[in-house]
Amino acid sequence: LHLLSRRQRQMCIRDRNYHIFYQHFPYDNKWGTMHWGHAITKDFVNFEHLPIALYPSKDFDRNGCFSGSAIEIDGQLYLYYTAIKYAKENPSNVHNQYSDDDLRASQALVVSSDGIHFDNVKNKKQIIPMIQEGFIGDYRHTRDPKVWKKQDGKYAMVIGSKVAYENDYCGKALFYESEDGIHFEYKNSYQEPTIGNMWECPDVFKINDQFFMIFSPENTDQPPKPNSNARYMPIDFDEDTLTIKEHGDWPYLDHGLDFYAPQTFLSKDNERLLLGWLRMRKPVQGEEWIGMFIMPRVLKEKEGKIIQELYPKIKNSFNHEVQEISFDQPFQLKTTLNKDSSLNLGGFKIDIQDDRLHLNREEVSIQENKVCNDVVSPKLQGHYDIELYYDHHVFEIYINGGEYVMSQVVYDLNDQVIIQNTEYKVYVRSL
């Protein structure tokens, strides 16, 4: 059920199919010169992988096609991405820059008439050159353009960046506008010095009458996950001027340890869907993939907060009740815990500590994760309803009807299953 990928960022609907694009290094399961992989699905259960959509082919993107977004304009599919060029090549590894100062980032576009074939030679163009003004953004670290059509018919773009602040940097979102989806003009920006020194993968969207911005800050001062997190904040947003007037708090979208780089789009039913990437520090032994998508979530708004629900088509697929848990197949587990409850699912442990759901994966982790194995939810006010999904070395846990979600990557589960001190029935269902 989890689409395997290096890192996701781009989704859209075309011809009744969901098109999913993702960063992809086709030669190894580690970081390298980024291409765009491409898959389509009608239901997020069955996927068809298509040929690589984007690959480096121009001087301005010769060292990689980083993340971006996709949108249909006048019957054609527009792919926006960050083009990467190194000012100085690294003689020991052509897939990494010689130093951070040698990175050059610009924003580029490819247009396809059928959404399947992308001419990387004739149909590429650089639409926003490398930033020259340091007070606007960073010439090295400005990336992940998200484009949407505004109510007035114009196109807006938000890009993640950073600017110098005191003795460090602070994260920043840059806003651009276009009449035709090709020629963009810088309009506005928003920065916040208290949450990370670089913002990746920004997205602005509306649920009901409330605008939200989501982003993935780097190098936050909040352990245990300074670089594997995504935040959202309700914003008072003027879409005409692309101005964030004020904002609320910025809670986590996912309270697990591996969630990063989410992106939203509208479903066929006009619901706001979210996909995100689960970061992995190393591949599962014997596998050729590293990293995966979460299962898609439907986002809803309640009193200025985001509530997340599993995409109904997937949730309804778990309709066969089983008596025993097997980690060889996906399963759903639903129950209500109390303050003395505990679950041990193959070495992945769940209990309640100080009114919080506590997750520990120390027994099913890797050495590289040794400082990131223990995490807790926010306080739950004595209510501990959980809806847990397991598939492909990952647990996704929805708490109290999607008020919070926690996702965790695990390695090498054992066969042990121990469920203790639950007053309520435990329901386990498979596909």
Positions of the model-derived regions?
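Beta-rich accessory regions
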Residues: P234-L431
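Entry beta-strands of beta-propeller and related beta-repeat scaffolds
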Residues: N17-I20, Q76-Y80, G153-M157, Q210-M213, ...
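Short, conserved, GDST-rich strand-edge loop motifs in beta-rich repeat architectures
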Residues: H24-K30, A83-D102, G160-D168, S216-N227, ...
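Single conserved hydrophobic/aromatic residue that forms the stacking wall/gate
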Residues: L1-L4, Q8-R9, I13
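Surface loop/turn signatures of beta-propeller and other carbohydrate-active proteins
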Residues: S5-R7, D28-K30, V45-E72, I116-K149, ...
